[in-house]
Amino acid sequence: QADVCAGGNNVATVANVVKQAVDTFGGIQVLINNAQASASGVPLTEHTTEQFDLALYSGLYAAFYYMKACYPYLKESHGSVINFASGAGLFGNYGQCAYAAAKEGIRGLSRVAATEWGKDGINVNVICPLAWTAKLEQFQQAYPDAFKANVKMPPMGHYANPETEIGRVCVQLAMPDFKYLSGETLTLEGGMGLRP
């Protein structure tokens, strides 16, 4: 485990994190971008530029910076990128305009990387999870109307366990058996992410 602050809102911080990871572990085989901050629950007309920037810089820009910085090492290892997006973007959830915009930007960035980096043996995929976390509980308490409008019990009858039902999918996506899967979005929402 590398003991670093992995904030992704500026190039210098990202370069330092990547350098420390390479110095500690000898390279990079897998990049997972899942950090995100936002002002979810605020309707679009009430969103401020600062709230919008928070979502874009902590999510979309962070993924962009980390992907660029890790690319040489991922190319060397024929590695994998797993980016986290959200049903908020897929389904246009109420009160989540900045978060949805950042997450859909990440999906677009991921598809471009899958196209451009495939020749280098790098596969790039996206996961849209729905897990019961402390952040989801905080969202429920802070924005009960937006929570009620957006978050329903999945058909599977429970929210995902982050470690066993989402983390293990990430592990599998990084394995050689799944190397040919690239440019895809997997919706891990217990049946809520049904799409044509």
Question: What kind of feature is each model-predicted range?
Answer:
Residues 67, 102, 110:
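Active-site helix of classical SDR
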Residues 1-10:
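Rossmann-fold cofactor-recognition segment
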Residues 42-44, 48-53, 147-150:
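Substrate-binding pocket helix/loop in short-chain dehydrogenase/reductase
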Residues 144-164:
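Catalytic Tyr-x(3-8)-Lys segment
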Residues 86:
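Residue(s) in the substrate-gating loop at a strand-loop-helix junction
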Residues 118, 123, 181-183:
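Short, small/polar-rich loop/turn modules that mediate ligand/substrate recognition or access, typified
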Residues 41, 91, 170, 182-196:
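Short C-terminal tail/terminal secondary-structure segment
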